Amino acid sequence: MSHDGIDLDEFRTGLADSVLREIAEHLAALAGSGATAAIDLRSLPLTNADRSELESRLGRGEVTVKLDVAGTSELWETRYSGVWWVRHFGDGGRIASERIEIAAIPQILVSHDEDIAAAATRVREEVEAHGSA
Amino acid sequence: MAPRETIGEELLRHGISRRALLKYSAYLATMMALPPMASRAIAEALANARRQSVIWLSFQECTGCTESLTRSFSPTIEDMIFNLISLDYHETLQAVSGAAAEEARLTAMRENKGKYVVVVDGSVSTKDGGVYSTNAGKTNLQVLKETAENALAVISVGTCAAFGGIPHANPNPTGAVPVSDIVTDKPVINISGCPPIAEAMAGTIAYLVTFGKLPDLDALNRPKAFFGDTIHDRCYRRPFYDKGLFAKSFDDEGARKGWCLYEVGCKGPVTYNACATLKWNGGVSFPIQSGHGCLGCSEPNFWDKGGFYRPLSTSTGGGATVIGGAAVAGIGIGVASALISRRRRTDATKEPKS
């Protein structure tokens, strides 16, 4: 995005370096003790260039997931196992929440116990309805 | 009355998975500057909470605040707020009208006595008994007193409800006052702005539902999560201010190069709001990014400060100094007591000198 001579896409503040150092510490902790962590990227004054730099240096790994709940979300594991980029979109496709999660798997991907119980009921009803037809 | 379902139960009944709450929790944590790892605990708290009864009263206002909150056209993360609350009364949005509408308000007040939240947009007319703004045969003043009496808390959305706003501007023909001048015996949260940022309204309500307490407030009773920094502090043009590079008019070289708008009247340095970070219209832009200085619409008496295009360094009748001082003091004070902050607010909203 360019505005009157300021190109916000090109302006780097150096924050990408800082975030990478923080990720490195958290990932070492995950590897050592299993401690999970998260970094809220929206709370940091990242420019578009900073975000692009961070995204590029973390790269993309083997897993990419698209979520469709309360709007869309995109998650991917970076090329560093255990480092996940989690991006939730809001109204008009803007980024509503964006975080780096350092975990074996982001919490939002895990099926919740109550959802599993409700699904078990629903699928039983489906089987019974089909059987009585 | 049968107890309301928990939010988790209701979402489950509608086939919405717990992931929706986890996602909203991440969004809420971002908005309210909460620790990112708190998301899971927030989601659990929300799942076990009951929908918050909300009564929305519209007084001397333009409906811009409601427009700001409901501007979304497709199901998005922002809409989740409507799964967390039971909007029991809202004149613009409710389907019923007339006596049935008023009965809905009275029913919600009766069934949720001491637990409902009152949201007000618009200032309150007090002159001649408040006759200049009435609805259903009652003055706004009467309805506010009656509705707030057994409320848990009151949220004043928009600068009109928070500080009197444009109806309060000189010569204030209706005797308009902010809600906090009328409601003095319970918490009043101010979400100022003309209009306020939707996330600030939704985030504050969601925080109340989740934690059952008020968020940290500044000296003007505004949530610090949204009003903790000035526009100037978070402005992408700030480096030009620091270098002394200013636009002198709206069509000069400085304006074309995107330099700081301080000298063409920007009120960013004394205006506390989150426009520079959350932005508007789905995060597209905010006034300064569009080439116009901040008007200071989230501060008291912004309409009467001597001109939108006059630099702050010229006299503005003392208003800017008072506001800047009060707001800076607020950061040091932390969560101000209602009495102290009310006194400061009264100082800041006093009639400007002509």
Language model segments and positions:
Chain A
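Generic structural hydrophobic/aromatic packing signal, biased to beta-strands
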Residues: 23, 39-41, 65, 86, ...
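Amphipathic, interaction-prone secondary-structure segments
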Residues: 49-82
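Helix-rich interaction surfaces within compact, conserved domain-sized segments
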Residues: 73-133
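Short glycine-rich, low-complexity/disordered patches
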Residues: 33-45, 63-72, 132-133
